[in-house]
């Protein structure tokens, strides 16, 4: 029997939100997704190709570096002052990849970045395992260990995306993982020191429409990782070899990492992390509006994290948390729209 207006106020609220109600909230939140679908701020990149050890390797590393830098400059419009490139041999605008130049680059980034900015660090080259717990990225001259890279990154404000594509790269995941960071490595063990094919497919991901799994015309770090991981598996299958290269991603800060086929709790941050800047996301001069945009970005991330935990969360708890987030997203989005 339908409740009347007279007794409607005494009706008990439903224990769980209805699917229709949640769907309505989701649709409402989606109306505002173009206002702020990721965090605002500038994008920076440090791309390093280290000591090659031979002409064949040098040519491959240079090809991957040049291709990726062209993507950042041409497709994603990275400004020259926000894109630092180091290589085995010096050329115009590209210093040698020495320990001193790496340290100088991080000092420069630390002075220029803000908490709203994002830095990508891409390492292409050879890696060396020291004792199973530590590894080095081979530079021209003295190398830097994973711990030393961590020390250089620790003072940086903003968000970090670190991609180490070398053999023996797993210790970098353990040493560099942290809150607000997305860390990718080409291997799941320090003992895997063979030459890797992961960088070839990672670089290719940002120019291949097939990498855009959700068809939103952007390739997230999760999508690039998934694409590259599939490329690695297919490469070994075509060679008829047992896969010895297993890429990992960590964005929970646990320092454990997961494969693309078994993400567990990892992947929520990576799914909403993009390399390309978006003019829509530039923070406005209006401090109130800027604060709303930051809050919306935080809620987007929380929503992705919640979705990643769905299988391990009791249904009642999941629905309640989802409702709370969607209501808040809709509220903040409406305020942004009113001020835009």
Name the predicted role of every residue range.
Residues 51-55, 89-93, 125-130, 142-145, ...:
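Solvent-exposed loop/turn segments at secondary-structure junctions
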Residues 51-59, 88-96, 134-140, 186-192, ...:
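Second-shell loop/turn segments in exported
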Residues 53, 66-80, 107-114, 154-158, ...:
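Sec-exported extracytoplasmic/periplasmic mature domains
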